[in-house]
Design a protein with these regions (language model features):
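Conserved alpha-helical segments that form or flank metal/cofactor-binding pockets of metalloenzymes
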Residues: 2-11, 73-101, 168-173
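Helix-loop segments that flank and shape redox-cofactor active sites
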Residues: 50-72, 134-150
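Internal, conserved structured core segments that host functional sites
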Residues: 115-167
Length: 306
């Protein structure tokens, strides 16, 4: 039977206006419940699918101890996914059905994870780019969330994501200091940077954030979060001598993207077309998923499905 949140929208707004956290269904309205379920699902799905994505690339680790570091990160990601799914279970969601019985295309996570990571270079860049995106998003939720159980759980998640970032940045610095490694790193960065720019979703001009911001599902808009991410990534890449199509504009005090965005992407070749397209075309690509979607989800569901 569907769990019904008992509060009205006005009661929830009054509860939040008083500075109180939402601790469970007893404090939720149907609209709040729908929203928090959605953001928890996106978060948990993202953490879960990162595991097979990272494991694929970890096979290219240069040494056994490096493989061990990658596996430690994967274990963290699975634990983070468990937090999200466990909270969804508390909110009336059938966890086994959600994880093991959904079709692959129904999973909600950034398109970037549908593109295979085929080298150690791409794994450490994923730690430096994708995990930075995750850190920006979850730090915003940690600071702004009105859902108490998740807010408290994210204190641990933030600390572990810092390790993932450090792992990626340490390797990027090491590779960038060697001309041969740097060239291979740059080749992967060329497709991964722009793909991570998409991570934060539609631009503010095309997306309404009303309920998300009002109910504290997030504290910043998509464009603000994208700016935060560039604020971490662009200076770092400049520091190590890697090229990214973005720079800080002193006049506007904002980061500016120096390439057509969004643009066409060839998921098989991992190449950008260089021609600007509309966000409606990007949405078609996102909804159609990418080449690894079914493979990764099948791997995650294999033990359950037999």
């Amino acid at each position: 039977m569907e769990v019904v949140a008992p509060r009205t929208e006005d009661e929830v707004r009054a509860h939040l206006a008083a500075g109180k956290l939402v601790e469970g269904l007893q404090h939720m309205s149907p609209e709040y419940l729908k929203g928090i379920r959605r953001i928890l699902t996106v978060s948990a799905d993202t953490e879960l699918v990162s595991a097979p994505a990272y494991l694929r690339a970890a096979a290219h680790a240069p040494a056994l101890n490096n493989f061990g570091s990658a596996v430690s990160i994967i274990q963290d990601e699975l634990a983070h996914a468990h937090i999200g799914y466990r909270l969804l279970g508390d909110l009336g969601v059938d966890m086994p059905a959600l994880i093991y019985e959904r079709e692959a295309s129904a999973f909600k996570y950034p398109y970037a994870f549908d593109i295979p990571l085929d080298s150690w270079y791409e794994l450490v860049l994923a730690n430096a780019l994708y995990d930075q995106a995750g850190f920006v998003l979850l730090s915003d939720v940690h600071q702004s969330s009105t859902f108490g159980p998740w807010k408290r759980a994210l204190a641990k998640v933030d600390k572990e994501e810092t390790f993932h970032l450090r792992h990626g940045r340490t390797w990027v610095k090491k590779f960038a200091a060697d001309p041969d490694h740097k060239a291979k790193l740059q080749s992967s960065l060329d497709w991964m940077f722009i793909l991570t720019l998409e991570w934060f979703g539609l631009p503010d001009a095309q997306k309404r954030h009303g309920i998300q911001l009002e109910y504290g599902f997030k504290g910043k808009t998509n464009d603000e979060l994208r700016q935060d991410w560039m604020g971490h990534v662009v200076p770092f890449m400049d520091e190590v001598g890697l090229r990214v199509p973005a720079h800080f504009d002193e006049a506007s005090q904002r980061y500016v993207i120096d390439c057509p965005f969004p643009q066409q992407f060839d998921s098989e070749k991992k190449e950008w077309g260089g021609v600007e397209i509309g966000w409606d075309e990007v949405m078609v690509r996102w909804k159609g998923r990418g080449p690894m979607n079914e493979t990764y989800v099948a791997k995650l569901q294999k033990g359950y499905r037999g």
